[in-house]
Structure formats: structure tokens, C-alpha cells
Amino acid sequence: MKLLEQMVYVECFMIIMATLLVSMSYGHRAMINDVAEAPVIDNVGSPTNGLDSSWYDARATFYGDIHGGETQQGACGYGDLFKQGYGLETAALSTALFNEGYTCGACYQIMCVHDPQWCLPGTIKITATNFCPPDYSKTEGVWCNPPQKHFDLSLPMFLKIAQYKAGVVPVKYRRISCARTGGVKFETKGNPYFLMILPYNVGGAGDIKLMQVKGDKTGWITMQKNWGQNWTTGVNLTGQGISFRVTTSDGVTKDFNNVMPNNWGFGQTFDGKINF
């Protein structure tokens, strides 16, 4: 991709919750104290409507192996990222970007900049699926401490924009629309008195700011975000057909009607059939 020469300034599971933090591997280069200002960048990718799609400065490292080991599951609550459609195109976000899990599912376009020795041309597109935790015991090489904006990429994604030996590189990033295949999926967890739903494969903005549920015998019930992208209600909806109303961070709302039949069970996944 060609780079031009001007500048663009562009969030418990109460019964069984455990903090899911994947151990992170960081590069070994000396700390980069300042990320240089960015050149003007060609208008590539698919910006989201209603979201800020300006380019911003950050850094990137990698964790896991070439096959995506250590990147599965994580603090967003997703499981097998391959089965859920995210694959290797994922990243763990620093505190400044993770937003207590509300950013889970968001999509970003990232490019390596200002480091010709290590940067490779082109961009990558990733989904936020994990959290890169801060480490306050150190003062150097701690890229995920606030207020730093940082992407801990899967190794295959890092290698698309930088050489392995770089370890950590300055990047430019922006929000883009998530392109998904098929409908939004709804995975059931919990028990009759603590229904937990994990929505995934969410298109459009990708990240959810509000989720509601409705049974055959109820009105719309606002769910609570528990951890990551797991949403809960204490209302017993067993034996009822279930519908969902989902609002993404850009304000778009969609109704997913009659997603779950009245004989649904826990541990099942249902297809919402439509997407954003």
C-alpha cells in the first residue's frame, strides 16, 4: 500500500466466573518512547458508519505460536476462535482499548509505520477477542499499561506487517466494519435462574453496547453485561421461545426473533439468521 506525505489525526460471572487472561509474550526491543506522527494514508478498508474511523497511533506485539496457540478463548468469553469464525485474525487489547470488555468483537485495520527496518507493507484486519493485562511491577517493556494503546496480535497477523525480530513496532490503526458470514450466533450458558448468552459472529460495528431478551410470556428484558461479551439475566425463561434485541456500539439495533425454540437447553448455540 502506498503511504502519502500528510497527516491523519484519527469493558461476574457471579457463580463460575474466573478471570480469563491469556499469558502474553512481548518483544525484546528497547522501548519506543514516542510513536511518530503519521503520514496521510490511502482510504483502504471499510469504515463503519456511525463510528470514528480515523487513524490513530498505537504499538503492536504478538503472543502465541504460528498456529494461534494461546490466543484461543480469553477475556472476551469466546471459545474456539476457528469454529466461531474469527480464526487467526485476532488481537488482545490493552486497557485503554479494551473498555472493560465492551470493545470485544470490534474490528480494526492496522499497519506498521515509521520503522522501515522492521515494517512490512500492507495492512491487516483483526477482531478484538482478548485482553492484554497491565503489569505494574515493571517500568520497561510493558506495552499494555494505561494509558498506552496496544495490540497484542496473534503471531501470524504480526508477521504480515512486521518482521519477527522486531518484537514491538509502532502502528496506525482505525475501526472498520466487521465482515461476517451468516447470522449472529447466540450461545447459551448458565442455569434456569442465571441465563448467560454469548453473542458472536457479529457484523457491522461488531461490539455490543446493549442486549435485550424476550420470552414468549414476557416483554423485552434488558440483560446485564457480565464479563467480556457474556450477557445475563436472572429471569427464568426455560420452556419459552426466545428472541433477542441487540444494539451495537454505533447505535444500530436489530431484532432476532424466535431464535431459540421453547425446548432449548444450556450449552447450545442458535443461529440468529440475520446480521448487521
Swiss-Prot record:
It is a peripheral membrane protein. SUPFAM superfamilies: Barwin-like endoglucanases, PHL pollen allergen. Residues 193-272 form the Expansin-like CBD domain. The keyword Acetylation does not apply. Keywords: Cell wall, Cell wall biogenesis/degradation, Membrane, Secreted, Signal. InterPro entries: Expan_Lol_pI, Expansin, Expansin/allergen_DPBB_dom, Expansin_CBD, Expansin_CBD_sf, RlpA-like_DPBB, RlpA-like_sf. One of its GO terms (biological process) is plant-type cell wall loosening. One of its GO terms (cellular component) is membrane. Coiled coil: none annotated. Residues 73-183 form the Expansin-like EG45 domain. Its main location: secreted. Residues 1-27 form the signal peptide. It is found in: Secreted, Cell wall; Membrane. CDD domains: DPBB_EXPA_N. Causes loosening and extension of plant cell walls by disrupting non-covalent bonding between cellulose microfibrils and matrix glucans. No enzymatic activity has been found. Belongs to the expansin family. Expansin A subfamily. This is Expansin-A25. The lineage of its organism: Eukaryota, Viridiplantae, Streptophyta, Embryophyta, Tracheophyta. The gene is EXPA25.
